[in-house]
C-alpha cells in the first residue's frame, strides 16, 4: 500500500468515527439567498454554529482536530498555508454544501486534490480548504471511457488503466492528483501523440461558487474554460470522464550525460538538442536537464525504431561523456521509474518559458548559464511538446493558449530543512527576470510562480478576458480568490 493510500485510510477512519465537527447542510433555496458580505468579519465561524448537525457528505475540521495538519499538508514544504477550516468532502453534494457554508460565513475557498501546486494554491490562509482527498475513485464507463475523481493520483490512475491496456495522455509523477494536472493542461510522455490531459476530457461534474452542480460536456463554454483554466478559478470539478487511448506495448529510454561543462560546450549541446528533437516522431519525448555543470539528456520512445531517433542517438553518442542506450521494456514497469518522490519536500519549481527553437533563448542563454554554473543545485530543464498538442480541434475546445510552442522549460531547486535557500532563490528570480526582459513571457499555469510579471497574460494569453466572463457567470462574488486566480473585471 502506498503512503498516499495509508494517509487516506487514516483520515477516512477519523472522519467516519466522528472525531471532528459536523456543520449543517444548506438547501438549494438557501443557496440563492446567501451573500458573501461577511468576508471581513473576525470571529471564528465555528463558534457561530449553535447546533452541530451531522452530514454524510462533508466533515469540517478545526485546527485542533487531529487530522487537520495531515490533510492541509501540500507537497511543497516551503509554501505553507493554514486555512481556518478544512471541509473534507465525501462526494459532490459535500462540495456543494462546503461552498454554501463558506459563502454564508464569508470564507474564501481553495481546492485541494493532490496538493502538488508549486505555490500551494491548494490551500488558503484563514479561509476554507475544500479537501477532495477521499474522492479518488476510478470507474469504467465503457471499454474506452473512464470516470476519475480529482484526488486519484497518477500512480493510482495508471494502476487502474494499464491492466486494461489503456492510457490517458498525462504526466509521470506518481503523487500528482488528476484534478490539478488536468485543469491546468497536463503533458507528459504521451502528449505529443494524443494531446494534453485536458484534451482527453469528455465530460465533468462541476460545482460553481453558489454550490450549484453542473454536468458539463464538450463544446460548452464552461468546458472550454476548464481545459487549461480551471484550477481553482471559479468552482470545483468533482469528476472527470476521459477518453482513453490504446496503451503501447513497450517503452524505451535512452540517457546521455555530459560532465564539467563550460558555456561553449553547453550551448553546443543545447543547439544539437533543438536540431534533432524537432524531427522526432510523436511517439518520442525528450528532456534536456542541466544541473550545475552536468547535463542529463533523456529520450523516450514507445513507437517503432525510426531514422530521426537513430540520428539523435548517434549525434549525442558522439558528443556526450556517458551513453546508455535502452531496450524496450514493459510499459507499467517503465513508468514506475518516473513516479518520483511522493512525500512533501522543500523546493522551488516554476515554468521558465515556452520556446520555439534555440533562437528564442539565444539572446539570454549566456546570462542564464552564468547563473546555473555558479549555483550548484539549480536545475534548468527544456522539455519537448509539439506534435498533436498543436491540434486545431483541441485548440478550439480549450483555453490553453500555448499549443504552437514545441518546447517548455522549467527551473527547479530542492533543499533540506537545514539549508538556507535564500541565495539560490534569488538566482532563481534573476533567471526569470532575464528571460522576461528578453521577451520570454509565456508560462505554463501548472508550473506557477508568484514572481511572474503580468501572470494573466503569461498563463492565459488572449484567453484571459473570456475567462473573466466565465468567472462572472460562475463566481460572481469572487469566492475563489487567491493571488493568481482569474479576477473579476473591475
Give residue ranges: language-model regions.
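Soluble FAD-dependent oxygen oxidases
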Residues: 2-490
